[in-house]
Amino acid sequence: MLKTVHQKAGRHTRPVRAWLKLLWQRIDEDNMTTLAGNLAYVSLLSLVPLIAVVFALFAAFPMFSDVSIQLRHFIFANFMPATGDVIQRYIEQFVANSNKMTAVGACGLIVTALLLMYAIDSALNTIWRSKRTRPKVYSFAVYWMILTLGPLLAGASLAISSYLLSLRWASDLNTVIDNVLRILPLLLSWISFWLLYSIVPTTRVPNRDALVGAFVAALLFESGKKGFALYITMFPSYQLIYGVLAVIPILFVWVYWTWCIVLLGAEITVTLGEYRKLKQAAEQEEADQP
């Protein structure tokens, strides 16, 4: 009886073990941690230019002036670790200084922000091992669309939420809306990762695989935020060593950890499809044998 149970358990866990082995092999071959380090470096160089461009877009639309403040607080509260308030103050100072730049400097900011998107495109297509390339004009159009429409859609969403909360007839729904807002960061992360894994690769990505990889990445991202905040609170060694400058290594580590999660989600998405193909090929080979 016990032997039968072990045999059945082994049959069920064997595919999982094989998939995990394939996942680990892909992570090692793609040098995922090195890719994450490269993206973290580019991200830190592009962070202020990217935020400056986004806030400049909001400034161009007076209707989003109030929403831009809400969006800033939402991003730093939900997509940064516990030191998000300190990081927010520094970044807002940098952005305020960038507003004094000339037209040539502003173009440089835009180019730097677009370089981050190019680096993301290159890293994900390395993981998917796609040899296809998009036309440069098409790639620029996609990057610019993400850079402009993304923040505007997020701002419109927050504006609609604020409007609904201000309505008297919606007062009974405030509890429901509050509960939805609690899981909103997870949902936004899931949707963002899904779009990233579906649109950026130059090869076809099965929607089911992208959803699974994005969900795992979103869970790890939200768990990582809480774990990172707990580590900073329980083991404040950075503050003891670096003092006022502690925010710098904290931001470095957080950005690197975030890119590790993003690329891990991409590896999961890739290996789900690859494992399915390998399994089908093995079954076909076994069926063809006399």
From Swiss-Prot:
Which residues span the membrane?
44-64, 104-124, 140-160, 183-203, 210-230, 244-264
Q: Where in the cell is it found?
A: Cell inner membrane
Q: List the disulfide bonds.
A: none
Q: Transmembrane helix: present as a keyword of the record?
A: yes
Q: Keywords on this record?
A: Cell inner membrane, Cell membrane, Membrane, Transmembrane, Transmembrane helix
Q: Which GO terms describe its cellular component?
A: plasma membrane
Q: Name one Pfam family in it.
A: Virul_fac_BrkB
Q: How does it sit in the membrane?
A: Multi-pass membrane protein
**Domain of life assignment:** Bacteria
Q: Which InterPro entries match?
A: UPF0761_bac, Virul_fac_BrkB
- Reply yes or no: does the keyword Membrane apply: yes
The UniProt entry's sequence similarity note says: Belongs to the UPF0761 family.
Read off the PANTHER family from this record. INNER MEMBRANE PROTEIN YHJD, UPF0761 MEMBRANE PROTEIN YIHY
| Name the record gives this protein | UPF0761 membrane protein YihY
Native source organism of the sequence: Salmonella paratyphi B (strain ATCC BAA-1250 / SPB7)
